[in-house]
């Protein structure tokens, strides 16, 4: 029998064993759905891709089920989780709890998307799956979507890798003339990168830059010809055209102690200077780190970010 001794450590994400088995070190826990209201929200899982055994987790405010549906539909939020394309899922407690809070705060129907993870499924699998999920949602294949979703108020959101995915879904929606159109996109601490610092304030040390490059080039996207300058990852500096962004407005959230801080600001500036006709808003928390709102959701700054999220959806 082949040995299962660990041969590669990629902390804090995974271990790859000698026999090829991938051991994920976090993001594996699953929180069950419930049609009995939990914090006044009901939830369910629905498969959207039988080919790849992928599902979405849907969250609905319980009070919406009591409304006369005529004229009372609610915003639809499509959410892409983070985790460096390697870990996490819509079913993990951290994302289940976060989407529950978003839904009850913003009174929206949320659809949290599962996508295939690297290294078993390198990029662009995550992008392909995410677009397939959007197409499935827009095909009105689910009763909650048909009964409660207002397709004049469709939003996309994500954090970290999920924010990167959200950007690319917005671009594809614009290029492919997705109809109805996306009203807005929220990108929280978007995972954009490049071989060189984006500006004089992007002062990550060599070890950090090397680690991010190694993870992208060896685990997430080993077939990238340009490494971390791959346009999937280097949205700001690769010459990617953002003018076809297929939504009306974008909210970019950045954190001053996040390695992606300057990239996020540069992305917002690039979008604003492009030929895109929409509006860009930035919210910045200088003393916070990457995805702080997921791990300290009761903090003042997390509440501030949630309030901005709410205002973006209802305005």
UniProtKB/Swiss-Prot annotation:
<feature type="modified residue" description="N-acetylmethionine">
    <location>
        <position position="1"/>
    </location>
</feature>
<dbReference type="InterPro" id="IPR029058">
    <property type="entry name" value="AB_hydrolase_fold"/>
</dbReference>
<comment type="function">
    <text>Carboxylesterase acting on esters with varying acyl chain length.</text>
</comment>
<feature type="active site">
    <location>
        <position position="258"/>
    </location>
</feature>
<feature type="short sequence motif" description="Involved in the stabilization of the negatively charged intermediate by the formation of the oxyanion hole">
    <location>
        <begin position="81"/>
        <end position="83"/>
    </location>
</feature>
<feature type="active site">
    <location>
        <position position="160"/>
    </location>
</feature>
<comment type="similarity">
    <text>Belongs to the 'GDXG' lipolytic enzyme family.</text>
</comment>
<dbReference type="InterPro" id="IPR050466">
    <property type="entry name" value="Carboxylest/Gibb_receptor"/>
</dbReference>
<keyword id="KW-0719">Serine esterase</keyword>
<protein>
    <recommendedName>
        <fullName>Probable carboxylesterase 3</fullName>
        <ecNumber>3.1.1.1</ecNumber>
    </recommendedName>
</protein>
<keyword id="KW-0007">Acetylation</keyword>
<dbReference type="Pfam" id="PF07859">
    <property type="entry name" value="Abhydrolase_3"/>
</dbReference>
<feature type="active site">
    <location>
        <position position="290"/>
    </location>
</feature>
<dbReference type="InterPro" id="IPR013094">
    <property type="entry name" value="AB_hydrolase_3"/>
</dbReference>
<keyword id="KW-0378">Hydrolase</keyword>
<dbReference type="GO" id="GO:0106435">
    <property type="term" value="F:carboxylesterase activity"/>
</dbReference>
């Amino acid at each position: 029998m082949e040995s299962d001794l660990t041969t590669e450590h990629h902390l804090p994400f995974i271990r790859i064993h000698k026999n090829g088995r991938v051991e994920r070190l976090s993001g594996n826990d699953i929180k069950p759905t419930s049609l009995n209201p939990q914090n006044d929200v009901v939830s369910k899982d629905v498969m959207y891709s039988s080919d790849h055994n992928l599902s979405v987790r849907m969250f609905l405010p319980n009070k919406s089920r009591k409304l006369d549906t005529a004229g009372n539909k609610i915003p639809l939020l499509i959410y892409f989780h983070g985790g460096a394309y390697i870990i996490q899922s819509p079913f993990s407690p951290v994302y289940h709890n976060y989407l529950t809070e978003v839904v009850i705060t913003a009174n929206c129907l949320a659809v949290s998307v599962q996508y295939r993870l690297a290294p078993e499924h390198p990029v662009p699998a995550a992008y392909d799956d995410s677009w397939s999920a959007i197409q499935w949602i827009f095909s009105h294949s689910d009763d909650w979507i048909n009964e409660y979703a207002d397709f004049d108020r469709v939003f996309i959101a994500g954090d970290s890798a999920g924010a990167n995915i959200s950007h690319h879904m917005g671009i594809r929606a614009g290029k492919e003339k997705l109809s109805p159109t996306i009203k807005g996109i929220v990108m929280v601490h978007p995972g954009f990168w490049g071989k060189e610092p984006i500006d004089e304030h992007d002062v990550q040390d060599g070890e950090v830059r090397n680690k991010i490059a190694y993870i992208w080039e060896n685990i997430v996207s080993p077939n990238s010809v340009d490494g971390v300058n791959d346009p999937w990852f280097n949205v700001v500096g690769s010459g990617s055209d953002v003018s076809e962004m297929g939504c009306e407005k974008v909210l970019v959230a950045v954190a001053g102690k996040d390695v992606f801080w300057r990239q996020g600001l540069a992305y917002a500036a690039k979008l604003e200077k492009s030929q895109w006709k929409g509006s860009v808003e930035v919210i910045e928390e200088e003393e916070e780190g990457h995805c702080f709102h997921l791990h300290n959701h009761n903090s003042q700054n997390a509440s501030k970010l949630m309030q901005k999220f709410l205002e973006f959806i209802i305005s």
